[in-house]
């Protein structure tokens, strides 16, 4: 690659000021009181390591094999063959593998794709990525680097392997044309005078390569790669959809599995696979997955049951229920029944039949983001890339200006009002809409009778503070974290009512917040004396947090776990050698209930 850029003083900032600029060295920012709370829970040094890890993606992808359609060995060899067919210099969907003279190619493939080393997870493969890479951002000696600035959520998706899509672009250098090489940086929220946070860049902003550019200093150390502009600057800010930049060099290189072995594999975070295994569903049982979208854990449970029995999957969003059914169909699973139902209303209060009708109206198919319970982003412009469990919210960036829409007919152009734009963005957030699905109908449920399930998985909506990569965390306050915890307790109350005596409840979250994890376990054990913590298999994570913490000027004490209880739960630390997301799992045995 070419040497680092040396822009002239007349056209760009002085070279000395750019020292270390074109790097990726993010620093995760928190609300001060939240940071103090986590530092008290983890210890200051450990929390600093966790914050550092959260700002970077894992260096591998975790693949769960559908063992009802294939085997781990067969899938492993199929993936190796794909690497061989594409050539070692290309890898799977763009993952670069450097071939060295005289080196055995089978060694390269074997080092890329490996079996999961943890006992009880024989159906899991790891595909290695790489990073962080030090990139050289090219420019002509007398010119500044052409740049595109993207939103934080867009950047988080790019770090996981996505391309840059149009809705994620905030600013662009002047005179960028299709085919130009551009550096991609990210605009992260900054503190504002009222005590809140804001990006502070209007969509469509022009970059001149000067220190006066928007977020010039703030973007130092926040360059995530470079690529080729797929359209001109004017095109990027004129259309609503499409790829804006094809990424050619990335700080982190992770494999993409779009359209690879569909139905045979599912890309899923390791702790999510573990949670389904810990539930230990048996063939013939009736299982409830209370917050099931997008269906990763649901299908994992069905496969563990050998597709024998019944797995009931719930979500309150029409489109997400359709996603669950679509995934079950791809994996040839017949025991899954998915219903549109808010998990907070999952216990029936009447003697009516469980199924009360079909959600077939347009207004029920298109809902606002507030109806969606998934906590974290993974797609850009509605394009799923490396879709993982717990991650399905579409990332969009709304402009303050009307868009000029360019139709297929180049002579046809029209302006779109902000009202119409907001409507389109809501649809993008919630997927393609019921009318674009085959069938298009989902069953609605009025709830289920108490004690009607053998096992219940509650993968609760949460603050999602364990997901990686995360470039900003300042939106969460102590009050909002406590609100999440109250909501989860209500959902857990429903789970307790639905599981039969002698059954099992598994509770999990993708957050590092002890208030949503250990404090929930404390609430459960203190409130329901017939519940007891159970040992877990497989056991990959570490112990829980012991003790308590005083909050809100010592007006509230949050109680956590005892030493013995902490050994029975699993807490996944993003900074640990497992190199996965922050996650928590607790398993409860249900004894004889009180009348």
What does each of the following model-derived ranges do?
Residues 100-106, 344-473, 477-481, 485, ...:
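C-terminal catalytic and target-recognition region of SAM-dependent MTase-like enzymes
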Residues 333-343, 437-438:
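Conserved SAM-binding strand-loop segment of SAM-dependent methyltransferases
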Residues 74-75, 193-196, 336-337, 468-469, ...:
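Intrinsically disordered, low-complexity regions enriched in proline, serine, glycine
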Residues 284, 307-309, 499-505:
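Short glycine-dipeptide loop
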Residues 327, 490-495:
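Short, conserved SAM-binding segment of the class I
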Residues 2-304, 314, 318, 322, ...:
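Glycine-rich nucleotide cofactor-binding entry segment
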Residues 264-265, 336, 531, 569:
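Short, conserved active-site loop motifs that form the nucleotide-linked donor/cofactor pocket
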Residues 287, 311, 457:
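Short glycine-aspartate micro-motif
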